[in-house]
């Protein structure tokens, strides 16, 4: 509302096993593990200074064939550390060749621009129930008892797609969330789907604002099937 650009960052959400904790760190390790001249990435969970592969064996079998052939059963893999699976990559010389990218958060975030910089604002916990793939901000004005009122609507779109078993069994998430910016309290307020009328099912990837006969509409793109069109009231 002040003309400064704010930042909204979608993320995986909290409805997943892929979360760092006090007991374990999670990193993406990138190196030429297979000695093919092509770097590959593997998600690593480190517990008590011991690195373990985070993903299940069937999820990484094509990317890391030597890792798969080094174990004889699923139970052996389940208890094996990377030290057991790739002994050559655990010495100091090989470790120096690995790029390690730590996972810090899977939460979606928002930063509001102020005169002195960006200020992170907490998003309602409901918005963290699933992945957010796109955002849309709409400023709508209406006259109420002679006063011109403007509300800033923030919409997020997403849901689970291309899910891997290692991430856990996700609970059902609302593919769309509708927030309103409360300027007085400088916070986001969640609008229930029953109140907003934005009730969706499925996996959605993007959202756009279009004008039809001078009226604002929302065009919502889905993973499969037909797109959805809503008219603002």
Where are these regions (language model features)?
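Beta-propeller-forming repeat regions
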Residues: 1-233
């Amino acid at each position: 509302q002040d003309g400064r650009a704010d930042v909204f960052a979608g993320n995986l959400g909290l409805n997943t096993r892929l979360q760092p904790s006090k007991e374990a760190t999670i990193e993406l390790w990138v190196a030429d593990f297979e000695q093919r001249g092509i770097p590959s990435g593997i998600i690593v969970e480190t517990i008590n200074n011991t690195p373990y592969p985070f993903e299940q064996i069937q999820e990484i079998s094509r990317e890391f064939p030597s890792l798969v052939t080094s174990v004889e059963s699923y139970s052996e893999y389940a208890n094996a550390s990377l030290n057991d699976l790739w002994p050559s990559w655990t010495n100091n010389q090989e470790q120096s060749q690995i790029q390690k990218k730590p996972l810090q958060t899977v939460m979606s975030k928002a930063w509001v621009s102020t005169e002195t910089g960006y200020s992170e604002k907490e998003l309602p916990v409901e918005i963290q129930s699933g992945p957010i793939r796109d955002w849309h901000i709409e400023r709508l004005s209406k006259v109420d008892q002679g006063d011109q009122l403007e509300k800033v609507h923030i919409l997020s779109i997403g849901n689970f797609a291309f899910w891997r078993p290692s991430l856990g069994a996700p609970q059902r998430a609302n593919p769309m969330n509708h927030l309103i910016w409360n300027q007085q309290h400088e916070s986001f307020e969640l609008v229930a789907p029953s109140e907003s009328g934005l009730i969706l099912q499925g996996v959605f990837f993007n959202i756009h604002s279009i004008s039809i006969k001078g009226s604002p509409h929302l065009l919502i793109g889905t993973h499969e099937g037909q797109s959805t069109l809503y008219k603002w009231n």
